[in-house]
Every structure is written in structure tokens, then in C-alpha cells.
């Protein structure tokens, strides 16, 4: 008699055997798209590394949820985020990158070639791996928040603050990131409401002092965001104060600054990360603690998080990968 557990174990073994038999060997594998992944692909392809790129769950990354991008060189009239990522993708493919839709579900970086499982069914064996999986902004989870993403709701003041020049905006969050966003917006916008759920700021004392010393920032302690309102764009926000009273603030932009989650979970058994999950790279490079595995873009950058810096680190990762492969006689 065969028990279910034994049957399941045998099925798993058979599946693993089937996967292993179909392993595809590649020189350079890029995990993730967006500015970092596509730029890495452009440089890797031009270096004749025959890169294979898996786009992941959100092809094009965070920029595909952005309407207008006006701060990336080469687009003097601005460009829609999705169109910009399509341009990056076409350029990567033009030089020979094999761009594929698929999600990397597990990895084994214990030895080279590195084993990467895609969609729980296909194995890639790669001599070099570039991780460009990005980070996901944390949101409040309101329906109205989803409704206005790209139409007044943003998770990046540096990216979108300019659209609200001379207008009133709100920033939600009480840490250093929220303070930095509020201070940045204070130099562009007429008024900045800082919505803080607790009755105190979690930011450093120095950052708090800068916020409280800025005349056009109003800190609303003990306020919870209940709803973002407007017709086609954001027009206001409904807050609940510590007394349970509902208060409306008229705003044009709503900036969420409660943190990001780096998409690094599947790499943690092998790759060193900080306490927040950002991949740690060696200073001045994209090298991780595993030789032959490189990281670029927002998965390793918690300071800048810009398309241009992500693209730059993607270039670095491809150059680092090419040099690594050359040193090992594999380029």
C-alpha cells in the first residue's frame, strides 16, 4: 500500500528528475525587467554574453504604473512610463537579448552553474546571474488609493512632485522617508500636509527638527487616512483625528511614504541582505557575497530609487558580469 506522503514524495522526485533533464544552459541570466534589468540586458548583449531575461510578475517594473516621466534624459517632452519601458525592451532585444515572460520561483546559488527555476517547471543553469527584481512600494490598501494611482497618488515625491508645483499635497508616513519626501515637496508645493497615524514622528530628531522648522509643512499627528476623494484626479483626502472626527483637506497630490519592500525573498538563503531585505553589494560595484551573482536597481538601492540610477546600476552589473565571465574563460 502506498501512502499519500510517499506518493507525493515520489511525484516530487519524478518532477525534479524531469526538470533537471530539461535544464537550459545560459551564459548570463537577468532576473527582472525595469530600467535596471533592461539596461543590464543592453550592455550584456552588446558584450556578446547572449543574455536571457525573465521579466517577472510585472514586466517593465514600477514605471509601468507611472503616467508621465519627465526627468529621464533623452525624452525632452516627457514620456509615458509604459512606453519608456517598451523602448528599453526593444533596444535590449535589438542587440540580441532573449526576453521572456516568466517568474523565477526558486534559485540555488550554492555552486556554478547557478540553478534557477522558472514557473516551478523549467530549470536554467547560468554561469552569471544579474538580479534586477526591484522593490514594491507599500500602500495603505484603500480602494480609493488604487483608483487614483497615477492620477494624484504616488509613492515617489522626487519622481512626481513637479506635477504639483504651487499646489497643496499630502504625505502619509512618520519616518525619515516621509520627512524627506515632505521636505522635498515643501520646496515645490504651496502647502504640505504630513499625515502621521501615531501621535509622534518616528524620524530622527534632526529630521523632525527640519520638518517642524519648515513653514509650509503642517504635521497632522494622530490622523488616519480614511479615503482619497476626487472625480478623475485627486481633489482631497478624508482623515480621522484622534477624537474620531472626520476632517477633509483639499489636495492635488497624495504621496505614500510608508516604505518599500525589496523583492529579494527567494534569494535570501544565498544572498546577503540588510535588515530591510535590500541586497548588499560590495562598495562601488554590483557584486554580491556570491561570486558570479550581481544585483542592480531598487532591490539593492534604498536611497535613490530613480529610473536613471537603476539604469546606471544595470550598466554596472552587466560590466561586472562580463569581467567575471572573462576572468573565468566564459565570456
For every predicted segment, state its role.
Residues 20, 26-95, 167, 179-205, ...:
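Beta1-alpha1 glycine-rich phosphate/pyrophosphate-binding loop at the start
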Residues 25-27, 101, 165-167, 222, ...:
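Phosphate-coordination loops involved in phosphoryl transfer and adenosine-cofactor binding
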Residues 34-35, 58, 135-137, 176-177, ...:
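Residue-level detector of alpha-helix initiation sites
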Residues 5-17, 21-23, 136, 141, ...:
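FAD-site-proximal beta/loop scaffold in flavoenzymes
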Residues 99-163:
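Glycine/small-residue-rich loop that forms an oxyanion/phosphate-binding "nest" at active or ligand-binding sites
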Residues 2-11, 92-118, 123-126, 187-283, ...:
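A Rossmann-like FAD-binding core segment of flavoenzymes
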Residues 309-325:
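An active-site-proximal "capping" alpha-helix that borders the catalytic cofactor pocket
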Amino acid at each position: 500500500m502506498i501512502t499519500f506522503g510517499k506518493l507525493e514524495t515520489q511525484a516530487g522526485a519524478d518532477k525534479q528528475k524531469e526538470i533537471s533533464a530539461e535544464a537550459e544552459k545560459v551564459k548570463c541570466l537577468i532576473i527582472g525587467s525595469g530600467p535596471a534589468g533592461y539596461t543590464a540586458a543592453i550592455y550584456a548583449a552588446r558584450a556578446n554574453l547572449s543574455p536571457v531575461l525573465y521579466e517577472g510578475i510585472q514586466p517593465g517594473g514600477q514605471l509601468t504604473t507611472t503616467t508621465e516621466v519627465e526627468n529621464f534624459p533623452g525624452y525632452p517632452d516627457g514620456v509615458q512610463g509604459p512606453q519608456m519601458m517598451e523602448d528599453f525592451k526593444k533596444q535590449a532585444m535589438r542587440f540580441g537579448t532573449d526576453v521572456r515572460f516568466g517568474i523565477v520561483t526558486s534559485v540555488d546559488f550554492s555552486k556554478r552553474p547557478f540553478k534557477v527555476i522558472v514557473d516551478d517547471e523549467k530549470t536554467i543553469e547560468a554561469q552569471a546571474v544579474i538580479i534586477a527584481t526591484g522593490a514594491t512600494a507599500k500602500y495603505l490598501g484603500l480602494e480609493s488609493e488604487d483608483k487614483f494611482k497615477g492620477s494624484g497618488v504616488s509613492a515617489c515625491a522626487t519622481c512626481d512632485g513637479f506635477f504639483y508645483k504651487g499646489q497643496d499635497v499630502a504625505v502619509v508616513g512618520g519616518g525619515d522617508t516621509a520627512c524627506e519626501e515632505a521636505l522635498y515637496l515643501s520646496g515645490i508645493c504651496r502647502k504640505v500636509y504630513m499625515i502621521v497615524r501615531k501621535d509622534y514622528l518616528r524620524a530622527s530628531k534632526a529630521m523632525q527638527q527640519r520638518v517642524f522648522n519648515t513653514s509650509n509643512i503642517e504635521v497632522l499627528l494622530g490622523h488616519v487616512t480614511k479615503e482619497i476623494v476626487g472625480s478623475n484626479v485627486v481633489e482631497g483626502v478624508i482623515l480621522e483625528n484622534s477624537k474620531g472626527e472626520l476632517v477633509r483637506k483639499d489636495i492635488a497630490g497624495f504621496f505614500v511614504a510608508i516604505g518599500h519592500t525589496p523583492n529579494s525573498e527567494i534569494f535570501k538563503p544565498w544572498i546577503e541582505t540588510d535588515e530591510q531585505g535590500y541586497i548588499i553589494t560590495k562598495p562601488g560595484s554590483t557584486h554580491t557575497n556570491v561570486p558570479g551573482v550581481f544585483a542592480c536597481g531598487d532591490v539593492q538601492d534604498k536611497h535613490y530609487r530613480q529610473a536613471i540610477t537603476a539604469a546606471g546600476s544595470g550598466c554596472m552589473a552587466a560590466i561586472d558580469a562580463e569581467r567575471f565571465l572573462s576572468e573565468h574563460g566564459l565570456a
